[in-house]
């Protein structure tokens, strides 16, 4: 299994992924915070269900592809674990309602993570608008020039069926999504471009860029949405 790391000065870089590289990343992060510079003790699992069965954890952080957020969150909430889930909270409105109800029943602490909203720039923008420093805001334009959204796309499902990379449990990765053969068009990273797995540019980067606008201007829920495309 591989994952893609993005270096804005050098472009895309492909690195090994999977259970063991993830474990080493966690251990090196903790080691950097210790005077000894060493840390061992992170147990890595392939299946989140096995983790929840075996480990007496207090909280769960979910940072998986969009289409699996809800099923993992529900499994954790049923065991009354605190949950921190990255945006978007779920893949659909129906899932969001289910997760919200489960959280109420569990009586635990939950939060949707959005680092775009948590950064200092978002706070500064909100303070500027609240202070009236730029007057009344009547119109907002938000766009993205993120290069990873211009990576190769497909008009339909690719016909090739290459072998599943070593270390990748493809059935587990698919989770609740309709089954399809593995292809690098879906994973890693570009699952965001497919409706069965991701929520598109709006759900991916829009959650970061639009959240500050909605919060600063106290807009509430959208009343209408219009979309257009060139193809």
Task: State the predicted function of each range.
Residues 72, 95, 121, 209-212:
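Alpha-helical packing segments of well-folded alpha/beta enzyme cores
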Residues 163, 167, 171-231:
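Rossmann-like dinucleotide-binding domain that binds NAD(P)(H)
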Residues 61, 138-141, 174, 226:
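Residues embedded in well-ordered beta-strands within globular domains across many folds
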Residues 54, 149-151, 181-183:
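Short, solvent-exposed loop/turn elements at domain surfaces
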Residues 38-40, 56, 133-136, 221:
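Short loop/turn motifs at secondary-structure junctions
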Residues 1-81, 85, 94-109:
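N-terminal glycine-/serine-/threonine-rich beta1-alpha1-beta2 phosphate-ribose binding loop
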Residues 67, 82-86, 90-172:
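A contiguous active-site-proximal alpha/beta segment in oxidoreductase catalytic domains
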């Amino acid at each position: 299994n591989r994952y893609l790391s993005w270096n804005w000065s050098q472009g895309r870089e492909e690195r090994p992924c999977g259970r063991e590289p993830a474990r080493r990343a966690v251990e090196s992060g903790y080691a950097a915070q210790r005077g000894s510079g060493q840390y061992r003790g992170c147990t890595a699992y392939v299946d989140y269900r096995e983790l929840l069965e075996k480990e007496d954890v207090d909280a769960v952080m979910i940072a998986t592809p969009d289409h699996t957020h809800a099923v993992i969150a529900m499994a954790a909430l049923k065991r009354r674990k605190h949950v921190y889930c990255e945006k978007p909270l779920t893949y659909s409105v129906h899932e969001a309602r289910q997760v919200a109800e489960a959280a109420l029943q569990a009586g635990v602490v939950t939060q949707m993570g959005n680092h775009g909203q948590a950064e200092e720039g978002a706070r500064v923008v909100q303070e500027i608008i609240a202070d009236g420093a730029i007057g009344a805001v009547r119109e907002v334009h938000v766009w993205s020039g993120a290069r990873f959204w211009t990576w190769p796309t497909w008009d339909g499902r690719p016909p090739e069926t290459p072998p599943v990379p070593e270390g990748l449990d493809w059935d587990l990765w698919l989770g609740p999504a309709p089954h399809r053969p593995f292809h690098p068009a879906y994973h890693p990273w570009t699952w965001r471009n497919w409706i069965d797995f991701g929520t598109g540019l709006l759900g991916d980067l829009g959650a970061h860029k639009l959240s500050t606008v909605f919060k600063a201007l106290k807009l509430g829920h959208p009343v209408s949405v219009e979309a257009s495309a060139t193809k």
